[in-house]
Regions:
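Substrate-agnostic recognition of the 12-TM MFS/MFS-like secondary transporter fold
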Residues: 43-60, 81-119, 151-239, 258-272, ...
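A helix-boundary/kink motif common to multi-pass secondary transporters
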Residues: 71-74, 101-108, 240-241, 249-251, ...
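Helix-loop boundary and gating motifs at the non-cytosolic
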Residues: 23-90, 328-378
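C-terminal ends and interior cores of transmembrane alpha-helices
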Residues: 114-149, 406-424
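Alpha-helical transmembrane segments of multi-pass secondary-active solute transporters
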Residues: 77-78, 108, 213, 253-258, ...
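Transmembrane alpha-helix termini and helix-breaking/packing motifs in multi-pass membrane transporters
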Residues: 63-70, 124-140, 222-261, 362, ...
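Multi-pass alpha-helical transporter architecture, strongest
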Residues: 126-127, 261-277, 412-419, 498-534
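Juxtamembrane intracellular "pre-TM" segments in multi-pass secondary transporters
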Residues: 12-41, 275-344, 362, 532-534
Length: 534
């Protein structure tokens, strides 16, 4: 079945006298298909909300669990946890992407959902055991690194890494594949309503559907990043039994709470994903038989440089898989937009993260002011999703991306300049204003690049390219964690800020070069339209 064909195209086999009846059947079929698509999209939002809320709650609480084990006297376990988890995504992201490309959609989603939540559930049990100490140990000033504790800590690190790579894979499958298929269905429904619909109108319908969906997904992401830690913090305070300030007695109840959240998420995500799959028959096209057919059709592919690819991957028997995967990624017409996005993951210093918070305290800024403006910064990120929606209706995606990354660069230039201002009040105003407004540019750029990749990455390598993108994002995040191991003094914040500013500057340069040197690749062509179908 070609997803570009109208979903309902019944012929009037019973003669002209039955034509009105056939039209009625067609209209009813279109309405039913439209209702199913709308229902599937709401199920997608619900599933994504539970996925992100449970993930953000776990990431927030696991840092507290690990810090509590050291009596909140060291960040070494928190840092090591971040290094292990992000390094895992960095090294195995592309492999997960390959698996997505060659597997049945529903089977992959169920596997990722089940294993991810089970990994977190098991890790919460490990945390509960780790934080369960005999009350006599409250007199001990340091953590108990006995054999049992070491094994538990290693298990928590490994299970957290498994959960993160599976969560990354699930997001790649949904955001880079499922949503694209559903957008094509929306385009077909529009065509079925009016058989005279032009191809350009079909593309606009698909792009508008993608834009609306991507905005809602990012709004859910940002809302969960704000609400999950806030709600978790409130519940943690209510669970404080006051039995001990050492070794995390008051956090044992929190481990059970996080376990319950993930168990609920497992059930909801599993049900919603299955319902979406059955509501949208086109998602079933990636059955094992059709995968083989796709491979036959794409046995030989030529990238922009004229190199031959087999099954969407560069022919090579001697190269390591990671190099082959990178070659496939950088052979895509939209690769430098994705690379520019990954460079923004270097910006942790100028983003109201932990590093910036510590530096502001060191400069004498009050915690209440920091907390207030951190909330404002998050709200500005949410505002960015609305700004994107407005810009996308008036400008092309490429132009939206160029404007947003340039805007973020200008905002962070103000932040970087503030570090050399001696007046504390002027410094604070410049830094906070730059950071808050830069969040608008960041999320507008994120959504525009995501949609460009959704539209331009061919079906046989969607998972692989998405996996490589996740790996590169994780790679630049790991670089910051490594730097943090050696630059722990707040006085070194300028170095982190320089790295962040350099990352955003490089992102703007790479994206600008791609736009102005290769703008022809964004012109609508028949090949581009075919690339958007499954």
């Amino acid at each position: 079945m070609d997803e570009r064909e109208p979903l309902v195209s019944q012929s009037t086999k019973e003669g002209s006298s039955d034509s009105s009846k056939s039209e009625s059947i067609d209209d009813d079929g279109v309405v039913l298909a439209e209702e199913k698509l709308d229902h599937a999209r709401w199920l997608l939002y619900i599933s994504h909300m539970f996925n992100q809320f449970s993930e953000q709650a776990w990431q927030f609480c696991v840092a507290l669990f690990l810090a509590a084990f050291t009596n909140n006297q060291s960040l070494i376990l928190v840092t090591s946890y971040g290094l292990v988890t992000y390094s895992t995504v960095c090294f195995f992201g592309s492999s997960i992407g390959r698996y997505i490309d060659k597997s049945n959609r529903l089977a992959v989603a169920r596997l990722f959902i089940g294993l991810e939540n089970l990994a977190v559930l098991t890790a919460t049990v490990m945390c509960y055991i780790l934080l369960s100490r005999d009350k006599d140990t409250t007199m001990i000033s340091g953590p108990l690194y006995d054999t049992k504790s070491v094994l538990l800590l290693v298990s928590i690190h490994l299970l957290g890494a498994v959960a993160m790579i599976l969560d990354s894979g699930f997001l790649v499958a949904v955001e880079r594949d499922w949503i694209v298929v559903m957008s094509v269905v929306a385009s077909n429904i529009h065509k079925s309503k009016d058989s005279s619909t032009k191809e350009e109108e079909e593309d606009n319908t698909q792009k508008e559907w993608l834009s609306d969906t991507n905005v809602k997904m990012r709004q859910i992401d940002l809302s969960c990043k704000i609400l999950a830690p806030a709600i978790s913090g409130i519940l943690l305070a209510s669970l404080d039994d006051g039995t001990s300030e050492n070794h995390g007695y008051n956090l044992r109840g929190a481990t059970l709470m996080i376990g319950g959240v993930n168990a609920t998420a497992l059930i909801v995500e599993y049900i919603c994903t299955a319902k979406i799959y059955h509501e949208i028959p086109e998602l079933a096209m990636k059955s094992f038989g059709e995968i083989a057919e796709d491979k036959k059709k794409s046995e030989i592919k030529l990238d922009n440089n004229g190199r031959e690819h087999k099954n969407g991957h560069t022919e090579s028997t001697s190269k390591p898989k990671i190099l082959v995967d990178l070659e496939v990624y950088f052979s895509q017409s939209i690769c430098w937009a994705g690379f520019s996005l990954s460079l923004l993951y270097l910006n942790v210093a100028l983003s109201f993260g932990n590093i910036m918070t510590v530096y502001l305290v060191w400069r004498g800024i009050g915690l209440e002011a920091i907390g207030l403006w951190r909330g404002v910064s998050s709200a500005m990120g949410l505002a960015g999703t609305f700004v994107y929606h407005i810009l996308a209706q008036k400008l092309g995606l490429v132009d939206v991306g160029m404007i947003s990354v340039t805007f973020e660069f200008l905002c962070l230039a103000i932040c970087f300049g503030s570090l050399f201002v001696n007046d504390n009040d002027v410094f604070f105003i410049m830094l906070i204003a730059g950071v808050c407004f830069s969040r608008i540019g960041l999320w507008v750029f994120d959504i525009s690049v995501t949609q460009l990749m959704q539209l331009h990455i061919p079906p046989p390598v969607r998972g692989l390219v998405g996996g490589v993108q996740s790996s590169m994002n994780a790679f630049f995040t790991v670089m910051i964690y490594v730097a943090g191991l050696f630059l722990s003094d707040p006085e070194n914040f300028k170095i982190f800020a320089s790295i962040s500013f350099a990352g955003v500057t490089s992102a703007a340069i790479f994206y600008g070069i791609m736009v102005f040197a290769r703008r022809r690749i964004f012109m609508p062509t028949k090949d581009d339209n075919n690339a958007s179908s499954v």
